Amino acid sequence: MNRRGRSRGLEAINRNTNFRNADLRLYEFGNVYHFDGSKTHEHPVKNYSESEHIGIWITGKKETENWKVKEEPTTFFTLKANAENIFSRLGIKTESCTIESISNDIFSEGLEYRFNNVLIGQIGYVNNKILKNGNISADVFYGDLCWTAILKVIKNHKATYTPLRKYPEVRRDLALLIDKDVQFSTIKALAFKAERQILRSVNIFDVYDGANLPEGKKSYAVSFILQDEEKTLNDKQIEKTMSRLISVYEREAGAQIR
C-alpha cells in the first residue's frame, strides 16, 4: 500500500480512537504505483507500473467486553492469523512460503512472505515514529498484501478437497534459545525436514530477546501440531517425534531447549 493508503488507515484509527472506538479491524483495497528509474523509455509513463494491494490495520482489544471472554489486546499474532487465513483460503500454504523477518521505515518488526520467490505480503508492528506523527498512542499492526501478485501465483491453482481427518490433533510446545540471526523460516524448515509424516504445522507464539538472556541470543516459543491420518497418536510416537525435532534444532540451529 502506498503512503497515502497507509495514511488513510491511520487517519481512520486516529478519528475512531478520539471518539472512544479504539477496537478496530480495518481493510482497504487500493492501487499502488511504482516508478522504475533504471529503465529508459521513449514515453516516461512506461516507467510506472500499477498493482493492487490490500491494506489491513488491527488495533485495540481482541474481543468486545463480555462475561465469557477474558479481555486481551490484539497482538502481532492476531494480524498474522488473519493474513495467513487469507493466503490459505486462496490455496497458498504458508509452509510453502519463504518467511523472513523484516524491519524498515514502515515496520519496526515484522514478517515478509514470498511464494515461488514472489513477494505476496508484509505484516508487522507499525513503526513508532509513524504512529507518533499520526497522534496514535496505541499499538497498530499493519499488513500489506500484494493482491496482483497473489492472483498471478494462484492462477494455475486447482482446488482439491480431502475428507476431514478422523483422528485428533496433538499440540506440543518447545522453548528454543537460539542466536538472534536464526530466522523462523529456518526453524520451520528444520521441523519439516525432521518429520514429514505426522507434522501438520509449525507456529511461533512468543519471541523474547530482553533481559536475562545470554548476549546475542533470543528465545522462540514454538508450537507443533501433530496428527496421523490413519490412527490416534500414542505417547511413544509423540515423544519420538519431539526427540527428533529437538535433535535437529540442537545439531543444525545450535539451539538450547529451555
Give the label of every model feature segment.
Residues 42-46:
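Small/polar/charged residue-enriched interaction surfaces, especially the RNA/DNA-contacting tracks
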Residues 19-20, 47-49:
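Solvent-exposed alpha-helices and their adjacent loops that cap or buttress functional pockets
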Residues 27-30, 39, 49-50, 55, ...:
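A carboxyl-terminal module marker
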Residues 1-35:
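Polar, glycine-rich mid-to-C-terminal structural blocks
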